[in-house]
Design a protein with these regions (language model features):
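A structural signal for short, well-ordered beta-strand elements
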Residues: 39-42, 141
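Cytosolic beta-strand hydrophobic patch enriched in CBS
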Residues: 1, 40-41, 59-73
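Short amphipathic alpha-helices in soluble, non-transmembrane regions
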Residues: 109-113, 145-157
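Conserved short beta-strand edge segments in small beta-sheet-based binding/regulatory domains
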Residues: 121-124, 153-164
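Helix N-cap motif at beta-to-alpha junctions
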Residues: 102, 138-146
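Residue-level detector of anion-binding/catalytic polar loops
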Residues: 38, 59, 119, 157-158
Length: 164
């Protein structure tokens, strides 16, 4: 999109519609394309591809194998993966808990949910402001909101909990 905008005439142009049409008919893909294209290998991790896309503000990346184009990964692909990772299409209890980043703390948390009959559909950890802690986003089914809240409070500080 940016390449096409750069190649298009300015809106402030004095050219009439016919002159614009003529000029655009002479415009080729070669004149508008990005030549120094960032790519990823087919065996690269999805999170690394997402990081490259985010850092470079790219909407997509060509995927290569042995110097051959084998596909493309797009921001829409990453959104679909994000939805899948968070089990966004499944109803349940979703909680964000800040807990100690000590060995076994996540295991204790997930075991308590399981012992209460909960089925963990998704569990994602992210950095907290304090490096001694992690933010854990968990989504579980087959568990009551109040039961899940009690477990979350036993294991850390609840930032958010809700039925979704």
């Amino acid at each position: 999109e940016n390449d096409l905008q750069k190649a298009a005439p300015s809106q402030a142009t004095t050219l009439d519609m016919y002159e614009l049409t003529y000029l655009l008919s002479k415009l080729t893909v070669e004149k508008t394309m990005t030549k120094d294209v960032k790519t990823v290998s087919f065996d690269e991790t999805v999170e690394e591809a997402a990081r490259i896309m985010s850092d470079g503000d790219f909407g997509c990346l060509p995927v290569m194998k042995d110097n051959l184009l084998v596909g493309i990964i797009t921001d829409s692909d990453l959104f679909r993966m994000f939805i899948e990772m968070f089990s966004a299409r499944t109803s349940g209890v979703r909680a964000i808990v800040q807990m100690s980043d000590e060995p076994g703390s996540l295991s204790v948390f997930t075991q308590k949910i399981a012992m209460a009959g909960g089925i963990i559909m998704s569990c994602i950890t992210t950095e907290a402001e304090n490096p001694a802690f992690r933010k854990v986003t968990v989504k579980a089914t087959n568990i009551a909101l109040n039961t899940c809240k009690e477990i979350c409070e036993q294991c850390g500080t609840v930032e958010d909990i809700r039925e979704v």
